[in-house]
């Protein structure tokens, strides 16, 4: 079965266009991947958002002077489509030699184009470099599980059977790991990420969580689907009162992708981590 992204610019030699070209955006329907997980648009068990940060955003003023900013794009997790990442990059590059009357004018164009591609309203923030620098590098709350000793004998597929919990002990905690890795389903390139699990429910065995996350190491899928799979596997095991799964992926091509899935209100912290 062919992956829908095979028809996108991903993995292909592309001409870089420097004049505004919204047709470069390549949407990919979420429905097929939802179906693989037993979901549909009507049965999504989470709320969420995919936050994209762009560090290579530039355009021209009417006088021809370049402007730079850091873009933050929030795509609802229940939108009909994701936007293929290379097409997103090519689209943003097409702004480089294009003139806009103001920052607000550009933001309106971005909101319009990205919302059409995603099939839902996309939030856009254009942030100054000083503003983002002032935030600094974020530090994760909770416990890092990466120093736990585990034995690993499989990397080819996610292994939810490794997950364990103590049904007799109820906790509220945050666990995180920097060892998440999966591969692009089209190019096979590695995607490196940090994963945060914030939950209230039966105590999750942290070593089993680490072994489970490592089992994604050779798995091929997009960032968004990896996080949704992790969310569903943890929800199935824990039946928690609250659960949030949040991944912060290392940037590629000037873009990083940060999927957030939760049983509760959507309130992600978008400060970049040290590898971003």
Curated annotation (Swiss-Prot):
Main location: cytoplasm
UniProt entry keywords in alphabetical sequence: Cytoplasm, NADP, Oxidoreductase, Queuosine biosynthesis
Record: residues binding substrate: 83-85, 223-224
Pathway the protein acts in: tRNA modification; tRNA-queuosine biosynthesis
Record-linked Pfam families: QueF, QueF_N
Description of how the protein assembles with itself and partners: Homodimer.
Protein name: NADPH-dependent 7-cyano-7-deazaguanine reductase
Species in which this protein is naturally found: Pseudomonas paraeruginosa (strain DSM 24068 / PA7)
